[in-house]
Amino acid sequence: MRKAINFQGIPASLVLAVPFVAAVLTACGGAATGNHDKESGMQQHLGEAQGTTYSIKYISEERIDDAVFEDLLDMVDREVSLWRPNSRINQINAWDRTDSLFGFVDSTQIIGPLWALSEELHGLTKGAFDPTVSPLVELWGFGLSEMGNVGASEVDSVMAFIGMVPDRFDMNEEEEAGYYKSTWVRKGDARAALDFNAIAQGYSVDLLMEVLRERGIQNAMVELGGEVVCRGTNASGDPWRIAVDRPIEGSTEQDRTFEMIVAVQDRAICTSGSYRKYHEVDGRKMSHTIDPGTGWPAANGLLSATVMASTGAYADALATAFMVLGAEQTKAFLTLYPGLGLDVLLMSDDGQGGYAVWSSPGFAAVSSQP
């Protein structure tokens, strides 16, 4: 079993889940809907994708066709959704040969970049972020499978093929003139599998914002399943206002209460939490956040981690990684990597039925009471 991760005293080098940070939205269903405020020029698109809802707001006299956003989100789903039987990631996960390669043309440029980002973040967090955790997620009943009897022997047997190391799971691409011609995957164990859920929605909001940027839109907010990226200002000329939930056990999307409002401009903000999705085993709560280094649900007292970063992919993935690391190791990480430009809010179990709040100076500077 891996020793606990420790970021204290290490020389610095520069560079899923259920999210709970949200813009205040009106839930919607079915096909995309929206409106246009003629006075402010604010356009809004609302819809459903990736098993959740999305909201896209931007200031422009010209409205973008809903299909542009719907098609992009569907493309991401076709590549990395574990709930679509024929998705690319499920084809990779089903590949049961260790003596040959699984190859494909990565024409959508989804899986290749996600793998590259995941490798970078895996190294940065010393394995706290790891998309090969999928078999453990299934073992603990937080994926498509029901939870069975789980003990040390079951965990140890699965841990034998967890890890972003070449002899367990490896991916490479051959690039030609800026176009990835072919991608191949090698498995060291046929049971190895990928799960990009802890980064895919953050990456998706980055892609959606890029659509807006390419059209010259300077002021926009994109939210998907609680993962948010903001550009410029809102219709009032102020930073976008994003609400962060209180980590109240048993709360739902309908009866949530807010801990604070955050002013966000030209950044992404994402949250991961443990207080809404868990199993109870013999009276003990088992978080859906699985520590890839131990194979067991994280049990460090951290209830919620909110991260502001330059991209949605980074904020999304690091929010999950910080839930694995816990509050103290997250603080050590922030000290070690100031060049990442992160601002973070942590809410932890105080051992007395409540929670303690800690925020980095940069996060506190842009936060206010709801």
Where do the protein language model's features map onto the residues?
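Mature catalytic core of soluble alpha/beta enzymes
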Residues: 2-13, 20-370
